[in-house]
Amino acid sequence: MLQYLVRHGESVSNLEGRVQGQEDIELSDFGRAQARQMADWSRRLSASPSAAPLTIGEVWSSPLRRARETAAEIAAALGLPVMVEEGLCELHAGIFQGHLWADLETAFPDEVAQWRSGDMHYVIPGGESRAQLAARGRATLEKLAGRDTSGMIVVAHGGVLTAALGSMLGREHPLLAAAAERPFTKLPALANCSVTQLEWPGPRLVSFNETGHLG
């Protein structure tokens, strides 16, 4: 079974340089255009002869608006419903949420220093740790991999997807070698509307952070 892991399109907070976490932020105009490009990508994917006998049978999304809006474009192109999975939510960034990244050091100097230390078990006040995020993301992808379908598209967030990938593959795969010494902190950032493929059982990383489908 193939999982196509998609980071949502650009959100308003991405554009503003603001910490989102689990705040329910909509897509920017550019993000909506990216989501439409993802709809075109999903049509090409389902029509490709090389995809046989793969069938995209399910589209899953985080409950957060920026992911649901992206998933809705994809699902509509495939004639499928969007199914929501709470475990795909982004990191709960606690007291950081809603603040501009540029203002964090001034507003929360001690907390930012601890977060940037790379301590996997440091819990942002009011939020969660990288270790908690990785465990949640990994368990969710493993659960979805057990579904009775040959292929699915999973729309989520950069933090939860990279944390889950680092947990599963960071010490084994060359594309994720940057995570070998400090998992969950040194993974390359996933681009908005990038596609990463996982093959199950395994998982085996087929591709990582692909953006060639975006204009």
Where are the language model's segments positioned?
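Active-site signature of alpha/beta-hydrolase-fold catalytic machinery across serine-
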Residues: 73, 163-167
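Phosphate-handling substructures
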Residues: 76-138, 207-209
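Active-site-proximal alpha-helix that buttresses catalytic centers in soluble enzyme cores
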Residues: 7-80, 84
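Acidic, low-complexity terminal tails and accessory targeting/binding regions
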Residues: 91-103, 166-215
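Generic beta-sheet signal
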Residues: 3, 150-156
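Short beta-strand scaffold positions
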Residues: 61-62, 135, 155-156
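Active-site catalytic microenvironments for nucleophilic, acid-base chemistry
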Residues: 41, 45, 77, 143, ...
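Short active-site segment of divalent metal-dependent hydrolases/proteases
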Residues: 11, 160-161
